[in-house]
Amino acid sequence: FDEKGTAFLHSCLHTTSEWITIDEIGFLESNSCKYRQAIRTLMKHKQLLMVVRKQKLPFLEELRNHKDVFLVDLDQPYGNAGCIIMASGQGTRFGGNKLLADFNGQPLIDFSLNIIKNLFTTCVVVTIHREIQSLCIKQNIPVLLHTFPHRNDMIRLGLETIGDYIDRCVFLPADQPLLQKESMISLLLCAENDRNSIWRTCYGDIVGSPVIFPAEFFEELQNLPLRKGGSLVINNHPDRIRTFSVSDINELRDIDTPDDLSQLLHRNL
C-alpha cells in the first residue's frame, strides 16, 4: 500500500474522470499512513465511490463520518423505516372508490403497494374500504380497516400500529401511480443519511408526497387537530425540511377526479 497503492491513488488525481471507485478499504489499508493521506488528498479533488468495511478503526470511522460523505449501509441501506399507505379517501370527487379504478390494467392502489415491497421494516395500509382490505390480505400486506372520517385519524391509527417499531415513517398516498420506486429508494437513502430532517419529494419549487418524518415528530402527528394532516407539522418546522427532486413532475401528481386519471393515463402512454 505504501508504494503501489499510494502511487495509484496519486495517479488518479490526473485522470479526466471526475469519479474514482475504490474497492475496498479495510484493516490493511488503514494501517498505511501514506495510503491514508493519499485518500484524504483524493477526496479533496475527486468524487469517490468507496467500499469501506464496518470495522471500528480510526481511519474507517473518519471516512464514514466525513461531512461530505453520503453513506449507504449495505446490510440495512434504508435504516429502520416504516411506511403508512394512506388509503382512506372517500372518492367523492371521483364518484366512487378511485383506488380500485383501472390504471393500465391494474387497480390504482397496486402501484403504491408495489413500491413499498422490500424497502421497510414494517408497513401498514390504513383504509376505510373493505375491498382494499381484501386486496391487501391477498398480497400479504398488513392492513388496518377503520371507520374514522378524517385525515388526522388515519395518521394517528397508522402510527399507533407501527410507530413503536421504527425510527422514521414514510407517509405514502395511494393515488400517485407514476411515482417511481427509484424515487422512493433515493428519498429513504437521504433520510438515513440525515436522520434529523423531515424529507419530502419535490419537482423544482413544487413540493409533494411521499414525506418522511423522524420518530421525534410522531407524538405531534398523533395529536393533530381535527381534519388536519402532516402539512401542519411541516409548517411548524420549516427549518427541518429537506427535499429530494424527482425526475418527472408526474411522479407527484395524484388522482382526485376521472379527468385526473385520464390525463395521467395519456401521459403514461
Regions found by a protein language model. Give the residues of each.
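Conserved alpha/beta core of the MobA/IspD/sugar-nucleotide pyrophosphorylase nucleotidyltransferase superfamily
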Residues: 219, 223-269
